[in-house]
Amino acid sequence: GIETKFSFLFNESLITRARNYLADEFLRSGYTHMMFIDADVQFNPQDIIALLALDKDIVGGPYPKKSMNWKNIAETARKHPDMDVSELNKVVGEYVFNVVKGTKQFTVTDPIEVMEIGTGHMMIKRQVFEKMEEEFPLIRYKPDHVGQEHFDGKNYIHAFFDTIIDTKDSSTGYLHSYIIKFRY
C-alpha cells in the first residue's frame, strides 16, 4: 500500500496562505509527494494513483471551472436531447488549465503539457519545494494567521504560493501572482 496523511485547513479564505501552511507541514513530514485536493473538486481515488504513476515533478488533474458555459450546455442539449443531465459537465465543462500554444486537440483522460493549471487537484514532488527553498531562501514570512498547529506567528515559513498587491495600479487594486521560474 501507499502510506498517506491527510491535512485539512478550515476557515482560511486566502488560498495562497493556506497552500503555504500545507506545504510547510508537508516539508516537516517524511513524505515524497504532496497532493492538493480542494473540497469542491470531485475525483476518483484511482486518479491519485494515476498521477503518481506519471512520475512528474508537478502534475495536475483536470477539473471543471466553478462557472458553467451555458452556451455550450444549450448547444449540447439540442444535439443530444437524450443525454443524462448529470453527464453534461463531462461534455461541456471548461477546465482549469491552459494548453501549450499549438495544441490542436486533446482529451482530459490523457496527459498533456500545459502552460498553467489550477492547484485544486495537483501533485507536487518534495524535491520541487526543496529546490525552491534552496534557490530562493529569502522568500519567507511569519504567518499572521495564528491558531493552526505549528503556526503561532513565531516561525518563518516559505512563500511558495505568493501573491502581491500592485500598489502602482491603484485604480484597479487587482492582486497579481508573483511567480518565480526556475529550471532543474
Predicted features and spans:
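Conserved catalytic core of nucleotide-sugar-dependent glycosyltransferases
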Residues: A23, N44-I164
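Short beta-strand-to-loop acidic/aromatic patch adjacent to the donor-nucleotide binding site
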Residues: S29-N44
